[in-house]
């Protein structure tokens, strides 16, 4: 199984990133996990230009990666409990999660996904959402392996 998380953000080495790397390391016994951070000058310029330019730039970056089972994170997506989330992981050998940039994700991109998921009804910083996603990936893998992490 291979799981990739794509995010549009500037690279940083902070405590959030350290925790994410820890979850990747712990998950490695169950699946290959990839953290794909994407940010370039084109995205920076597009975000400065406004919402429509930014969403178009996100589409250009993400569309070539729409392979396997694709899950978009969006505040209006389905809310799942950890067991339901684990079923997504259990049912697919290649899973790609996509976290939007400052302007979220375009409807076009969400329409191409197999699943659109919300981590919470609350708004949270992208780095917090990403950390929560990696924890839920680890938890889901543990549920599927009958590992005691999920109690």
UniProtKB/Swiss-Prot annotation:
Gene that encodes it: rlmH
Binding site for S-adenosyl-L-methionine: 73, 100, 119-124
Protein name: Ribosomal RNA large subunit methyltransferase H
Assembly mode: Homodimer.
Keywords: Cytoplasm, Methyltransferase, rRNA processing, S-adenosyl-L-methionine, Transferase
EC number(s) stated in the UniProt entry for this protein: 2.1.1.177
Chain's role: Specifically methylates the pseudouridine at position 1915 (m3Psi1915) in 23S rRNA.
Keyword Secreted attributed: no
Pfam families named in the record: SPOUT_MTase (PF02590)
Enzyme class: transferase
Catalytic activity: pseudouridine(1915) in 23S rRNA + S-adenosyl-L-methionine = N(3)-methylpseudouridine(1915) in 23S rRNA + S-adenosyl-L-homocysteine + H(+)
Coiled-coil ranges (or none): none
InterPro entries hit by this protein: Alpha/beta_knot_MTases, RlmH-like, tRNA_m1G_MTases_N
GO CC annotation: cytoplasm
Family matches, as PANTHER family: METHYLTRANSFERASE (PTHR33603), RIBOSOMAL RNA LARGE SUBUNIT METHYLTRANSFERASE H (PTHR33603:SF1)
Places the protein is found: Cytoplasm
A GO MF term: rRNA (pseudouridine-N3-)-methyltransferase activity
Family, per entry: Belongs to the RNA methyltransferase RlmH family.
């Amino acid at each position: 199984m291979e799981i990739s998380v794509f995010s549009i953000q500037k690279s940083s080495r902070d405590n959030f990133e350290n925790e994410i790397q820890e979850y990747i390391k712990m998950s490695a016994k169950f699946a290959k996990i990839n953290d794909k951070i994407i940010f370039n000058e084109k995205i920076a310029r597009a975000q400065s230009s406004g919402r429509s330019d930014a969403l178009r730039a996100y589409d250009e970056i993400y569309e070539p990666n729409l392979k396997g089972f694709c899950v978009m994170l969006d505040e209006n997506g389905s809310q799942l409990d950890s067991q339901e989330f684990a079923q997504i992981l259990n049912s697919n050998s290649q899973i790609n999660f996509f976290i939007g940039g400052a302007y979220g994700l375009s409807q076009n991109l969400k329409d191409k996904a197999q699943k659109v998921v919300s981590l919470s009804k609350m708004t949270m910083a992208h780095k917090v959402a990403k950390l929560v996603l990696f924890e839920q990936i680890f938890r889901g893998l543990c549920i599927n392996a009958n590992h005691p992490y999920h109690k």
